[in-house]
């Protein structure tokens, strides 16, 4: 059964940014609430309050709601109108389909001078003779009763016959009170019988529906061992019989005729709640546990797993002789939730308990590996040096001999060299060479070119160089 809690009110106050002290409208319908409480202390500014389709049996703890204008208590278990004198601005009251049999309790609403609309249809008092005339005369401020407007002539006629109508209402109330007392006794007797039957079932069988004895044997005999394989079959049969009994009990409950009383409503709700709990318990039993993720098979094979569903890239850096793993970890995730385990043949990363595992093509050195995380993107970069050292051609002494032999081979068989060559010949590029587009030497003006100077001959001492005379070609 539900209760009014602060969390419940706050969840239904999303339209007010979950602020409850300034709340003006609140809807708590279909919450299986049995008692009105805390609302008058937490939400004093309420103007509209919806409490229909609950199990409220008494109007209480609403006297401090001075600003309340509309109160909806339809489809509840209310038997008397009371404790509404403090709701000074109450304009509309809905008590449709309740169990109000004391029609004289409407006199408590005479203090609510602003009350204009009242709904009492579906209550036992609405079947009383003279019901409408009594309410119209008792509540002079009413304008509408059960959705029908009260005219002035109707009120005058009801006022003329008020004495006889009031006496008639009192007699019908007494008869109803006697009938209700019998109904309560009958409901109490049925409840005690059901409790006794349940206690007998629990005492006759175990907590799980099986029979038990106090006889214990230290070592079972051979015949008993032969009977053990048949135990699951008997358990399954007992389970099936229990399910069939539950189905029969459920059908019997719904087909059983019952009176429309607050006790019958409570009984129906308890039965539905019991069924719901049994269904939840059965679903939990049937729910299978998730099998553990297999990372390494029994024969030692490492599997590739990406349960975290992260993007990644694996690169083989031949220049630095290492393998680089770039894992796209969530940007705002805390680094403490990441665990990295580098092994010679695989790398494993646990991201929030979910494994990411990759098998490596070559062995790496775990002790020299490093893991770094980017502060901007959040990516995790794992560098794993390979076990084998990088081999370079310039570090060995017999390189010259080999180069000569290879050069001679290349000269003898140039076609073979051309076929086996991995790199593209630079002379066969289809793109033009940008560096040779402008040829400075060819287009340089002649006057800028350096002119050769004729040095005077040492043989002719009288030679004088005239710069105006052009040189002989």
UniProtKB/Swiss-Prot annotation:
Residues 305-402 form the CS domain. It comes from the Eukaryota. It holds the Pfam family CS_DNAAF11_C. Residues 456-467 have a biased composition (Acidic residues). This is Dynein axonemal assembly factor 11. Belongs to the tilB family. Gene3D superfamilies: Ribonuclease Inhibitor. Its main location: cytoplasm. Residues 153-205 form a coiled coil. Interacts (via CS domain) with ZMYND10 (via C-terminus). Residues 397-408 have a biased composition (Low complexity). Disruption phenotype: Mutant mice show primary ciliary dyskinesia defects such as hydrocephalus and laterality defects and die within 5 weeks of birth. The morphology of mutant motile cilia is normal, but their motility is completely lost. The 9 + 2 arrangement of microtubules remain normal in mutants, but the outer dynein arms (ODAs) is absent from the cilia. Keywords: Cell projection, Cilium, Coiled coil, Cytoplasm, Flagellum, Leucine-rich repeat, Repeat. Residues 188-202, 273-283, 417-431 have a biased composition (Basic and acidic residues). LRR repeats lie at residues 22-43, 45-66, 67-88, 89-110. The keyword tRNA-binding does not apply. GO terms for biological process: axonemal dynein complex assembly; cerebrospinal fluid circulation; cilium movement; epithelial cilium movement involved in determination of left/right asymmetry; epithelial cilium movement involved in extracellular fluid movement; establishment of localization in cell; flagellated sperm motility; inner dynein arm assembly. Mainly expressed in cells with motile cilia. Expressed in epithelial cells of the trachea, testis and ependymal cells of the cerebral ventricles. In testis, abundant expression in late prophase of meiosis I with a dramatic decrease after the first meiotic division (at protein level). It comes from Mus musculus (Mouse). It is found in: Cytoplasm; Cell projection, Cilium; Dynein axonemal particle; Cell projection, Cilium, Flagellum.
């Amino acid at each position: 059964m539900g209760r009014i809690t602060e969390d419940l009110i706050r969840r239904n106050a999303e339209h007010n940014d979950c602020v409850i002290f300034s709340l003006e409208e609140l809807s708590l319908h279909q919450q299986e609430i049995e008692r009105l409480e805390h609302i008058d202390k937490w939400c004093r500014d309420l103007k509209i309050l919806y409490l229909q389709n609950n199990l409220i049996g008494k109007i209480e703890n609403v006297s401090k709601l001075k600003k309340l204008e509309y109160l909806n208590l339809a489809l509840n278990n209310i038997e008397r109108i009371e404790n509404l004198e403090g709701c000074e601005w109450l304009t509309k009251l809905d008590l449709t389909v309740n169990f109000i049999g004391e029609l004289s309790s409407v006199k408590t609403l005479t203090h609510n001078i602003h009350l204009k609309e009242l709904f009492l249809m579906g209550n036992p008092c609405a079947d009383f003779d003279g019901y409408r005339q009594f309410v119209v005369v008792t509540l002079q401020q009413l304008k509408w009763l059960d959705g029908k407007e009260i005219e002035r002539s109707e009120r005058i006629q009801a006022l003329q016959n008020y004495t006889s109508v009031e006496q008639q209402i009192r007699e019908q109330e007494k008869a109803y009170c006697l009938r209700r007392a019998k109904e309560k006794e009958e409901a109490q007797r049925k409840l005690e019988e059901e409790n006794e039957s349940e206690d007998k079932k629990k005492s006759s069988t175990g907590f799980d529906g099986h029979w038990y004895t106090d006889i214990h044997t230290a070592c079972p005999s051979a015949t008993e061992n032969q009977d053990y394989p048949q135990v699951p079959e008997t358990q399954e049969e007992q389970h099936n019989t229990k399910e069939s009994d539950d189905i029969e009990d459920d059908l019997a409950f719904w087909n059983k005729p019952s009176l429309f009383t607050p006790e019958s409503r409570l009984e129906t709700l308890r039965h539905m709640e019991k069924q719901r709990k049994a269904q939840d318990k059965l679903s939990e039993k049937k729910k299978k546990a998730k099998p553990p993720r297999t990372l390494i098979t029994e024969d030692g094979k490492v599997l590739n797993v990406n349960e975290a569903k992260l993007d990644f890239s694996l690169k083989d850096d031949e220049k630095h002789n290492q393998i680089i793993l770039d894992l796209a970890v969530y940007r705002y995730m805390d680094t403490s939730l990441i665990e990295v385990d580098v092994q010679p043949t695989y790398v494993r990363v646990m991201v929030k308990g979910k494994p990411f595992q990759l098998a490596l093509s070559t062995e790496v050195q775990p002790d020299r590996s490093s893991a770094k995380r980017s502060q901007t993107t959040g990516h995790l970069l794992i560098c794993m040096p390979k076990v084998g050292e990088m081999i370079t051609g310039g570090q060995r002494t017999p390189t010259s001999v080999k180069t000569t032999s290879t050069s001679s081979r290349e000269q003898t068989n140039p076609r073979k060299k051309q076929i086996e060559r991995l790199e593209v010949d630079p002379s066969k590029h289809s793109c033009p060479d940008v560096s040779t587009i402008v040829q400075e030497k060819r287009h340089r003006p002649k006057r800028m070119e350096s002119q050769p100077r004729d040095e005077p001959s040492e043989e002719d001492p009288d030679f004088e160089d005239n710069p105006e005379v052009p040189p002989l070609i």
